[in-house]
Amino acid sequence: MKKIVCLAIVLAVFANVNTFSASKKSSGKKSNTSSTQINSEAPQVALKFLKEYTEVLENNTTGIPNDVSNPEDYDVRYIYFKTTDLITERFRNELLKLTIECYSEEDGCGADLITGHQYYDPKLKILSYNSNKGIVVIQGVDMPDFKVKVKVKNVNGKWLVDNSGF
């Protein structure tokens, strides 16, 4: 039952941002994202956040078992979420809460809270950026099927990540 509740919470968090309207038609045209947009601060913040996060996962050498009762002290993801200055407070609080909830589950939450996948590519690039919606799509270099949508938001003149993996 806890797994179902945890999964429902994860899905609710990542489903709260509707990135594409139902009327959007698929076409074979290339994205109209310009290199100027991709090189702007907002998508670069999204890329930096995902690169830092995957680096944290890559360098996780703590050897701490999964049955530790206090992930706040040991879980590298929790520690990263708590200390990074690249995410909004709303997103930080949601991630910290979900990390603890997933940690208490026997099998965790399944998909990663940030990427929405069970795997990741540490080599990343910006695929597209919709400045109107604040949506950045990050793609794996070695695994092009690995794509993560990241929502960015300007808070007091600073671009921050406000959602990811939805």
Residue ranges and their predicted role:
Residues 4-13:
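Sec-dependent N-terminal signal peptides
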Residues 14-20:
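C-terminal segment of classical bacterial N-terminal signal peptides
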Residues 22-131:
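Flexible low-complexity loop/turn motifs enriched in small/helix-breaking residues
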Residues 126-133, 152-158:
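A short, structured loop/turn motif at beta-sheet edges
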Residues 133-135, 147:
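Intrinsic-disorder/low-complexity, polar/charged segments enriched in Ser/Thr/Lys/Arg/Asp/Glu/Gln
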Residues 135-141:
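Short beta-strand segments that buttress and anchor functional surface loops
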Residues 145-166:
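Short beta-strand edge/turn micro-motifs at domain boundaries
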